UniProtKB/Swiss-Prot annotation:
This is Glutamyl-tRNA(Gln) amidotransferase subunit A. Allows the formation of correctly charged Gln-tRNA(Gln) through the transamidation of misacylated Glu-tRNA(Gln) in organisms which lack glutaminyl-tRNA synthetase. The reaction takes place in the presence of glutamine and ATP through an activated gamma-phospho-Glu-tRNA(Gln). Belongs to the amidase family. GatA subfamily. It comes from Bartonella tribocorum (strain CIP 105476 / IBS 506). Its EC number is 6.3.5.7. One of its GO terms (biological process) is translation. Heterotrimer of A, B and C subunits. Gene3D superfamilies: Amidase signature (AS) domain (3.90.1300.10). One of its GO terms (cellular component) is glutamyl-tRNA(Gln) amidotransferase complex. It comes from the Bacteria. Keywords: ATP-binding, Ligase, Nucleotide-binding, Protein biosynthesis. It catalyses: L-glutamyl-tRNA(Gln) + L-glutamine + ATP + H2O = L-glutaminyl-tRNA(Gln) + L-glutamate + ADP + phosphate + H(+). The active site is at K79 (charge relay system), S159 (charge relay system), S183 (acyl-ester intermediate). It holds the Pfam family Amidase.
Length: 494
């Protein structure tokens, strides 16, 4: 019998519609897979088995009556950043210890409305701050991928490492994730999965724990481009509760897959050729260029001159917004409370014990750049640079370019015990060098697997699109996927 967890969302959907499969059977298969994998991979921080069974049974009842939502009976994992009513929501931080919200995020509400089943909450970097999923209060996530002939434990990327690892390990059909500077696309590239950061404003941020509010955007991680397109259609919506939500129709992204890209203009930015970049990343990029050229696209060399300033300005803007957003966590009404002799000491004790080192580092940086005497020199200048980064992209798209192709990451996944990266914050931050400019400009970006490194690890390519043109980058990503194929990790943990 086919292992039901190997089915894509599209395949499972079709099997459920034709009654070859029941939602309860599919859910039980995933719960069993989680039971086998999670003690090793640590992808889930909460498993909602009984809730999943109940939701699946309700899906079966609807399917029996010929009623079905877009994701009817499809079991999903939810990043621990999304508020889920009555279920553990802690942003993988000790400071939110025991917090169970009495409300539902707009995105998860959309998914449940469409019939999806919740398997549980997924591990992540604390408050989404990290690129390796090592800053979580619940410990690191282990990637399902390994180097050839090696037992070294690898990172799945971050901050959505639990989402990417769970999808790659086939312990959920798809997952929600968030991306502030690359937290969907980098883990997707590291794990051979597909991840899209939609245009800022496409998906509601209501009920999603904030990191940097002007940069945060939610999106899906899935096994292939089609599954990603199906998930985004359900997740995206206009929401009056989010002042940055944009009231535009949500296309049927899946319907664009398989359409010709003949005549499309694809930009190749010279600034993304970094000094010291590995030859296999350059070769992968060239391979992607050739695939698109063979599919009829026109390749154009372009310049994004302010790209090199995007990362340093991001690491001023994001911590500044984080220090403001995280000021609300004080131990008074919910989460962790560490007693003190007075209220000030209680605040200090709670925040000192509740926040991890990386979160404290970013709060300190953010508070510093917003402080009197440094605001103009730091934060204000960084915002001006952000405007220039966005202007570069605008000029490029105004010149007729339909999408931009770049590598997704400068390297494949690295080891959990890699002290060089672990002890060097800048080296860790450089993981986001190709992804951060997209967040700074508020554009859609997708990471699609395009090959394997010499060590047998996944490598991804990134496509960047015009605002609210996610269907175009899905269309192009599908071409790359057809040429590159699908990459699956061996289940060494069973």
């Amino acid at each position: 019998m086919t292992d039901l967890t190997t089915l894509t969302i599209a395949q499972a959907r079709d099997a459920l519609i034709t009654k070859k499969l029941k939602a309860t059977e599919l859910t039980e298969a995933y719960l069993k897979a989680i039971e086998l994998a999670n003690p090793t991979l640590n992808a889930y921080v909460t498993i909602t088995a009984e809730q999943a069974r109940k939701m699946a049974a309700e899906s079966d009842r609807r399917l029996a009556k010929g009623e079905r939502g877009l994701l009817e009976g499809i079991p999903l994992g939810i990043k621990d950043l999304f508020a889920t009513h009555g279920v553990h929501t802690q942003a993988c931080s000790n400071i939110l210890d025991g917090f169970k919200p009495n409300y539902e995020s707009t995105i998860t509400a959309n998914l449940w409305q469409d019939g999806a089943v919740m398997l549980g909450k997924l591990n992540m970097d604390e408050f989404a701050m990290g690129s390796s999923n090592e800053t979580s209060y619940y410990g690191p996530v282990i990637s399902p991928w390994r180097k050839k002939d090696s037992n070294e434990k690898l990172v799945p990327g971050g901050s959505s490492g639990g989402s990417a690892a769970a999808v790659a390990a086939q312990i959920c059909a798809g997952a929600t994730a968030t991306d502030t500077g690359g937290s969907i696309r980098q883990p997707a590239a590291f794990t051979g999965t597909v991840g899209i950061k939609p245009t800022y404003g496409r998906c509601s941020r209501w009920g999603v724990v904030a990191f940097a509010s002007s940069l945060d955007q939610a999106g899906p991680i899935a096994r292939d481009v089609r599954d990603c397109a199906i998930l985004l259609r359900s997740m995206a919506s206009f929401d009056e509760k989010d002042s940055t939500s944009v009231n535009l129709p949500v296309p049927d992204y899946e319907s664009y897959l398989g359409k010709s890209i003949k005549g499309m203009k694809i930009g190749i930015p010279k600034e993304y050729y970094l000094a010291g970049m590995s030859q296999e990343i350059i070769d992968l990029w060239q391979k992607g260029i050739n695939w698109l050229k063979e599919a009829g696209a026109e390749i154009r060399d372009i310049s994004l001159p302010h790209t090199k300033y995007a990362l340093p300005s991001y690491y001023i803007i994001a911590p500044a917004e984080a220090s403001s957003n995280l000021a609300r966590y004080d131990g008074v009404r919910f989460g962790l409370r560490v007693p003190g002799k007075d209220i000030i000491e209680m605040y200090e004790n709670t925040r000192s014990v509740g926040f991890g080192d990386e979160v404290k580092r970013r709060i300190l940086i953010g508070t510093y750049v917003l402080s009197s005497g440094y605001y103009d020199a730091g934060y204000l200048r960084a915002q001006k640079v952000r405007t220039l980064v966005k202007r570069d992209f605008d000029q490029c798209f105004d010149s007729g370019v339909d999408a931009i192709l770049t590598p997704a990451t400068p390297t494949p996944a690295f080891g959990i015990a890699d002290e060089k990266i672990k002890n060097d914050a800048v080296a860790m931050y450089l993981n986001d060098i190709f992804t951060v400019p997209v967040n700074m400009a508020g554009l859609p970006g997708i990471s699609v697997p395009a090959g394997l490194s010499s060590n047998g690890l996944p490598l991804g390519l990134q496509l960047i699109g015009k605002p609210f043109a996610e269907e175009v980058i899905f269309q192009i990503a599908h071409i790359i996927e057809q040429e590159a194929g699908i990459f699956c990790a061996k289940k060494w943990w069973i």
